[in-house]
Design a protein with these regions (language model features):
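Structured, non-membrane catalytic/scaffold regions adjacent to prosthetic-group chemistry
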Residues: 2-202
Length: 202
């Protein structure tokens, strides 16, 4: 028997082209995390680009906060089936980070690594060409810790578990290495428009 709510109902025509299959729209911003929210001290915060264990470039908070900023308005989609439209973010584009660091990606893949030990894998192509940023502000204010502040990865065209909270490094990998949820049955890519939620989804 269908449950009350979105299941079994078509989305309104005005949002149908923005709402991936199996999703429902929310005006809230649900908080879903692996564990307790880590306390990240800005005085000791550091973000790095790494090739395996070798650092290629790194920034303190003061240095990172002085980098060129970009604003984005994007829809976001969680694997738990909620979508939120027109979210406003500000941060440093991955393209700009690579350019400022003077590097070309040495591999085709990387792992985003977080201060709480979380990791998730991404193809480089999904981070460049204006598709992703390290976000430090949301809705005109500093990014709250519960939503990944002081800085999180934002990859809005993939399910939101790929937008790692409390990010501390992007580590280039020689192959597509599974991260935390990918090792536990989540899809290696996570395209919401193809409903790539779990291993075995097309």
């Amino acid at each position: 028997m269908p449950t009350r709510g979105f299941i079994g109902r078509r989305p309104p025509a005005e949002v149908a082209d923005r709402l991936p299959p199996g999703q429902h729209r929310t005006d809230d911003f649900p908080v879903l995390s692996l564990g307790p929210t880590p306390s990240v001290n800005l005085d000791t915060w550091k973000f790095a680009l790494m090739n395996g264990p070798r650092p290629l470039a790194s920034w303190t908070w003061a240095e990172f906060d002085a980098l060129p900023r970009t604003s984005l308005r994007k829809d976001i989609h969680c694997v738990t089936k909620w979508s939120k439209f027109d979210t406003d973010w500000e941060g440093v584009m991955i393209d700009d980070l690579f350019s400022i660091a003077g590097i070309a990606p040495p591999t085709d893949y990387l792992l985003a690594q977080s201060y709480d030990g979380y990791e998730t894998n991404l193809p480089i192509v999904d981070l460049i060409g204006g598709r992703a940023m390290i976000a430090t502000r949301y809705a005109g204010a500093p990014l709250e810790a519960e939503h990944g502040g002081p800085a999180r990865l934002l990859v809005p065209h993939l399910y939101f578990w790929k937008s790692a909270k409390w990010v501390k490094a992007l580590r280039f990998t020689a192959r597509d290495e599974a991260g935390f949820w990918e090792l536990r049955g989540y899809h290696m890519y996570g395209d919401p428009w193809r409903e790539q939620r779990y291993t075995g989804d097309p």
